[in-house]
């Protein structure tokens, strides 16, 4: 925020001294202002100062003029609008802003208490009236603010400054921001309304525009405005040296050494457009780069130097140099001492370095995702500063260790057993596990052998009659004096049945050694730890679980690929069989076709025969019908003949 404020307000300062004031001949008004300021200096309480109508008119004539009202420590700005009555002061918690003045033009302003710090109080901001005549000469002439005014005005200004210095103050005057920010986002955060400065506008500083001096302070005058005597500089286009209290052509050179350290903004003359105003930033300044420009006035004499203490650096300004070489000497005495690190904490420090590096990458990724590159860069700067400090501390610590401990473990000597372990990925199967298992087996076997010897010495019964229990429960052996001896649990696999002869101990040790030497090991991957052992090409339980499953899969695949029929058939037989099969197929097809044709012929013949038979039957039926008809006709004729004969007889 401070960087945006200072960079954004640099252009306002570049046009700070380009104002044309219309009240250069108002000597009466100036005298009235001086009288009012004398009254203020005689009292220690804050009073409300009034300005004449002429001064108000002069203020209102400048449209881009900012006026700061000191009544009840409130800020007000007017853009050609009459000033409001003085607001009331709140209960030491903030300032009551009038809705028609500054708060209406500057929304969302942050209210603060009367003190920026516990030991710093906000000074009274006076009513701003320009009673000076700034003659910006392009011909290398000095711009003395009060050069055209009466000498009485200069004397009054000097008296006012002396009275201000003699007034009792409980604490040094704090830092007050000089100008509000100009909102030119998003196209450019540094240009004012996207309009470049005119060619006739001279830059008051001997440096590039858009930059502001980090320790630039304006003197506070008690004459109802700003004492611009501390800025009697050469404002010209030929880049002359700007020295406070050194290049003035008037007789006021010795009267400008006033110990005024508070900052009050001057009137700002921008171009024809009205800027958009952001809230004032009341945060104290931080460490900024050194830029040549007008600086604060020195105390008491021109040969003395002023030191402005910030958070990290203490710059000193040489006000009396004619070449305007403002040198800022940084005191490194306040830097904390580096604590050396012990050789045992080197590993932890390197882990911190690794974490800091990864955090930088994470922060850059977050800024790329969110698009907030400004805040992301600030976070990366903080992390990088801690990283560089850690590296410097490690460098000094390692150099000290090299000098004092030449055989330290930071060199990673292989002979040193207590060296810092290397952070590497552990292997899947460690040999240390095998060693630990062998050691456990040796210990168990030794315990079993000792228990057997104790039982042989203490028991009256033979060893064959002593109870042998399983591996899950301990064995209880009775002694001759009636006490019970609890032996360690004996594994059934490591304690075979012993004979009653004297060679039982030797046989048990030989068997145990043989079983220890026969630790299972996978013939494929070489591992000695597996939840289950499987069959392999070397025999049963020769492969670990994973290798055995893969081997079984391969065996099944080979069996499916290498299947052969029971009767071995040659290639010729297979070819001949194929030919025979083809021939048989063709013959079968022919036979089926012939059979089908014959069958069709038979069916056709049968159909023809049936048709012939039907025709014959029909013919026979017709013949029979004709015969019957003929017979019937003959009978009728005979009857008729008989009747005729009978008639003839009668």
UniProtKB/Swiss-Prot annotation:
Cysteines joined through disulfide linkages: none
SUPFAM superfamilies named in the record: Glucocorticoid receptor-like (DNA-binding domain)
Coiled coil: none
Listed Low complexity bias regions: 16-79, 130-180, 221-260, 273-334, 442-511
Region (Disordered): 16-96, 111-181, 221-335, 409-515, 619-650
Positions annotated as zinc finger (GATA-type): 522-547
Bias (Polar residues) ranges: 116-129, 261-272
Biased composition (Basic residues): 425-434
PANTHER family membership: CYSTEINE AND GLYCINE-RICH PROTEIN 2 BINDING PROTEIN, IPT_TIG DOMAIN-CONTAINING PROTEIN
Protein name as annotated: GATA zinc finger domain-containing protein 11
Gene assigned in the entry: gtaK
